[in-house]
Amino acid sequence: MNNKDCFVSQQEIAEHFKVNRTTIRAWTKQGMPYLDADRGKSGGYHIGHTLFWCMGKSHLEAIEHHGETSALEKIMVARLISLERDKYFSEETEQRFDNGLQIYGYSPEDVSKARNKMAGFLAGWRHAVAVRREHLQQSVVTERES
């Protein structure tokens, strides 16, 4: 995942998401992963990491989560959700994914903490949804009995 060929320019990532470069600059300020380049060379956006960041951001907005989440946590929440749907999950693939995030300066501990925090967050959120759903079903049953 550290392959520089996976990195694209601001214009290319804007075209991929069908937005303008101003939006990409705003997203970058919000934490979208961006790799700084050496002097005189352009940096870039990793297509996969950027996609996971956008998916995580969208998911957290959709569930109206207003707490602070880092860019790494946004990536991890999307990664965890996608893993639930992926029947080809392997520990080796996840280790490579996690190692690939180190290119931004994250330590293995940072990545592990973000993964664990978001796994706990998702478990808690799903439990809260299940409890709420059960409560609503009980309310409907009680209302019908009245």
Residue ranges and their predicted role:
Residues 1-6, 58-146:
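Basic Lys/Arg-rich amphipathic helical interaction modules
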Residues 10, 18-20, 45-46, 114-119:
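Intrinsically disordered, low-complexity regions enriched in Ser/Pro/Gly/Gln/His and often acidic
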Residues 26, 39-40, 113:
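Proline- and acidic/polar-enriched loop/turn elements at helix boundaries
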Residues 30-63:
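Short helix-start
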Residues 1-29:
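Polyanion-binding surface elements
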